[in-house]
């Protein structure tokens, strides 16, 4: 029993010293890490998403971007994409009513122009 307590105490002390060493080492490495992140291109962090607001009148391109489908997608793909996005952003589950309205508008616009 006593040897277990000693082993636990030594482990906690070793973890404390290791944590202190890591924190001190981070102070010396921090400027280098900042420099590396500043040298990376801006597109490395958010380039995969559309970075703009909504247009006053929704276009076919904008509707396709909202649903994440091709502008020439068929009705089945449009419905699947709409369902997937609305499950994530439904107003009854805490989603934005404005975004939900835009998603529905995008579906209506693309379905009106899509083929079966």
Curated annotation (Swiss-Prot):
What residue ranges lie in the Mitochondrial matrix compartment? 25-116
PROSITE patterns per the UniProt record, alphabetical: DNAJ_2
Q: What are the protein's UniProt keywords?
A: Acetylation, Chaperone, Membrane, Mitochondrion, Mitochondrion inner membrane, Phosphoprotein, Protein transport, Translocation, Transmembrane, Transmembrane helix, Transport
Q: Which residues form the J domain?
A: 62-116
Please name every pair of cysteines joined by a disulfide bond in this record: none
- Write down the Pfam families for this protein, in alphabetical order: DnaJ
Its principal location? mitochondrion
Identify residues that carry Phosphoserine: 39, 70
Its Gene Ontology cellular component terms are: inner mitochondrial membrane protein complex; matrix side of mitochondrial inner membrane; mitochondrion
Concerning its family, UniProt says: Belongs to the TIM14 family.
This chain belongs to the protein called Mitochondrial import inner membrane translocase subunit TIM14
């Amino acid at each position: 029993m006593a040897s277990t307590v000693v082993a636990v105490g030594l482990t906690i002390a070793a973890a404390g010293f290791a944590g202190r060493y890591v924190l001190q080492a981070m102070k010396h490495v921090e400027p280098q890490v900042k420099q590396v992140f500043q040298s990376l291109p801006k597109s490395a962090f958010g380039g995969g998403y559309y970075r703009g607001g909504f247009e006053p009148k929704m276009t076919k391109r904008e509707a396709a971007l909202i649903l994440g489908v091709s502008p020439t997608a068929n009705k089945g793909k449009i419905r699947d994409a709409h369902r997937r996005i609305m499950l994530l952003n439904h107003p009854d589950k805490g989603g934005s009513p404005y975004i939900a309205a835009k998603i529905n508008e995008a579906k209506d616009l693309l379905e009106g122009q899509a083929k079966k």
